[in-house]
Amino acid sequence: MLSTSSRSFKNKFRAAFWPVHNYELGKFIPMSTLMFCILFNQNVLRILKDSILISEISAEIAGFAKVYCVTPAAALFVIIYAKMINYLTFEKIFYYLSAFFISFFVLFTFVIYPNIHIFHVHPNNLADWMERYPHFKWYISLVGNWGYIVYYSLAELWPNIFYVLLFWQFANELTTTEEAKRFYTLFSLFGNSSLILVGFLMMNLSSEDTIIKKFMSISDSKITLVQVSTTIVAIVAIICCLLVRFISKNVFTNPLFYAKAKSGRSTSERMGLIKSFKYIAKSKYLWLLLICSAAFGFAINLVEAVWKAKIKELYPTVNTYAEFNSLYILWTGVAIMVMTIIGNNIMRMHNWFVAAVISPVIIMVTGILFFVLIVFDQQILSLFDGAILMSPLALAVSIGGIQNILAKGTKYSIWDTSREMLYIPLDEELKTKGKAAVDVISAKVGKSSSGLVQSIIFTLVPTATFTLISPILMVVFTFVCLAWIYAVRKIYCEYQKIA
């Protein structure tokens, strides 16, 4: 009786905390490692792109870059990718895209950035033109600082291409719906633990007492930070390619891990490009998915834009900005891991809607609190006079950091894993080209729409700042979050029909 009770407890414990069978480790371990490496690079690039662009130019320029550079690049990529999957294997697509991105990052790091005065317009000339044409000053800055803008744009595309699209397409092809319920939250748990490693690593590399000083002399700390970080990114990218090769040759060919191994992976004739997009456009399911993904990008970018402007005021140099950003990434990793464990059990005990709606609700509540602090900062400080032991600027940065940690924590743990489950019941065309269109375009449409709102205001009112336009952004933010919650409810109804 005791033995039966003990066995029952063991089974329940395993189901809750380690629902992976021993024979599945050959599939689970390489996929978890691949996710870890992709997210490692993603977060190193995230720290670098913001630290470089915002410290070297300004926080306001980011919105313009997202609208006029990142979004067109994302749209172009979707068209190229839709063509590539008709002629190339997933493995080759992954190699070619990795080679392209890493080649530019290396070129920027070792050639363009150290000699930026050669490649960019002289700062004095740029300032003169911006002063002469104040309504177009941000567009002039985009062109004059093209090196920073291209680097920022490609680093912005990395997560949507390598993580959201390629990794999850790989995982969805390899994983059954039943396995997804057990694997996906653990993928998130192990993969997002990379944020903690990135946080500690980048805090050290960007600090004054960096370990780099023990191995080499440093003439320019910001150049050294970017060069060492990019070298690490290139090495990890090579490891990603080796993992994709291993999985393709050893997992996809094993009937134990992949049900289609005996008959081979799907080679059915695919639709042409125009027909494919027409097919996707008719899918209400994908349109709802697009709204959800775009809403997150739109909402979080409104909050982040104001927050990052405050960070630059507090940490004006590339290295100090990167050091703070690294601390934020570290705590985001901790939040994601905690929320992944919570989300895993929520997904088991409740339906898909309950798990999926957590993210927009938390983001809306914390975002509104942040905007209230920015808009009514003086009233709040006078109300709690003497009780707050930090400056208004430091308080705004701290509250914004907490908001972003909670928002990203729920999004990257609970929302991402629940969203990927929506693709599993779809047919092959919607799983590949449909996913590419939704995953790459939607996030960028969300961010660029947010950036468009900001860019219109800054173009019409050249003297505007993020602090001044915060009341407008707060209203828009609330509306977008409510639309996201509505779309989650509608897509749950559609999912129930086909799951």
From Swiss-Prot:
Which residue positions does the secretion signal occupy?
none
Q: Which PANTHER family match?
A: ADP,ATP CARRIER PROTEIN 1 (PTHR31187:SF1), PTHR31187
UniProt subcellular location: Cell membrane
**Chief localisation class:** membrane
Q: Which family does it belong to?
A: Belongs to the ADP/ATP translocase tlc family.
- Has the keyword Lipid metabolism been applied to this entry? no
Q: Which GO terms describe its molecular function?
A: ATP binding; ATP:ADP antiporter activity
Q: What protein name applies here?
A: ADP,ATP carrier protein 5
